[in-house]
Amino acid sequence: MKLQKPKGTQDILPGDSAKWQYVENVARETFKKYNYGEIRTPMFEHYEVISRSVGDTTDIVTKEMYDFHDKGDRHITLRPEGTAPVVRSYVENKLFAPEVQKPVKVYYIGSMFRYERPQAGRLREFHQLGVECFGSKNPATDVETIAMAYQLFNTLGIKDVTLHLNSLGNTDSRLAYRQALIDYLTPMRESLSKDSQRRLEENPLRVLDSKEKEDKVAVENAPSILDYLDEESQTHFDEVRAMLDSLNIPYVIDTNMVRGLDYYNHTIFEFITTIDKSELTICAGGRYDSLVEYFGGPETAGFGFGLGLERLLLVLDKQGIKLPVEESLDVYIAVLGSGANGKALELVQSIRYQGFKAERDYLGRKIKAQFKSADTFKAKTVITLGESEVESGVVKVKNNATREEVTVSFEELTTNFATVLKQLEK
């Protein structure tokens, strides 16, 4: 049997991983500007953490979760999304305590798992970065969090991303709309997909989220949830829109957007772009003011988003955005003869200790092959070290682009390599 990676997973190899690291670092620096700190939760959780919070009737729980019973007969699931584990951690670690500064702002970066049909930008193991803010009902929190994602896209140079916005209102608004949607969809029940016929009984808002053609036709003229917002919900949504306008963040109202998770209320949003004539959601989130209480904590407002790294990198590639990834070496040491092996190790280590990126030959190859490696590594400078250089304590350092050379002592290399580089830059 040929051993291969499981379907729907990928190996992120050197070169590609540098792009991932760059995007992750830009995200970290962006989140830090908004006073977010990193949180790391387990890759697997008790099944109930996900099923009860995400929703028993959602596709995630009914079709997509990787769940199993462990050797202690505990029902475990690999995490399919990031919010529920973070909320569980917030409650378990009592981050709601009065001595903890509010709002609590955290971000995460890590793998998520869903059993879906693999396609571009959507794998069974996918990587997500996300943020969660606990303790603020202020609509400014909604807008600040959306603005943070917007700033991240701008920093990365991504264009043609549209913010889709909607409100699910509070519980009363949602219940009123739920009944209106049932009244609208029931006469056309038989024309809905089998999944949506089930959703109509269990959670009719899910029908709006369906990707099936017959369901999309059915909901074209469905009532808008915005017509069922009570005064409190309408005020919150109006303030969110006004603040987005004040920050010059453009958006469109999308009344059919409900998000694929059951815990949202009030503001929900998605950032959507177009790839190969197909819409692609690259970031989505919203407000969830009951989830902390649902996990056994005190009444606590929450707002956050998740962003798929595979999708983000796909967009960067499709838009031709070249990431400023550092791929070159500061120096490559070509080694001639076994007598220079030990000294080559000393020199390359001392240069690394000074903060430079350095490599050397380990394979005893001919000098031409070593120079070719230096070119492949995009080495800025090359040092040729043989037994005669070891005896004299002096080497030539060559600028690999201009071919200019300087002669320096081992002491200069090991104590002040920066000065050596400056000599070659003149």
Curated annotation (Swiss-Prot):
Enzyme Commission numbers on file: 6.1.1.21
Catalytic activity entry: tRNA(His) + L-histidine + ATP = L-histidyl-tRNA(His) + AMP + diphosphate + H(+)
Compartment(s) of residence: Cytoplasm
Intrachain S-S bonds: none
CDD domains per UniProt: HisRS-like_core (cd00773), HisRS_anticodon (cd00859)
Keywords for this protein: Aminoacyl-tRNA synthetase, ATP-binding, Cytoplasm, Ligase, Nucleotide-binding, Protein biosynthesis
GO BP terms, alphabetized: histidyl-tRNA aminoacylation
Main location as per UniProt: cytoplasm
Subunit structure: Homodimer.
Family: Belongs to the class-II aminoacyl-tRNA synthetase family.
Protein name, UniProt field: Histidine--tRNA ligase
Protein species of origin: Streptococcus thermophilus (strain ATCC BAA-491 / LMD-9)
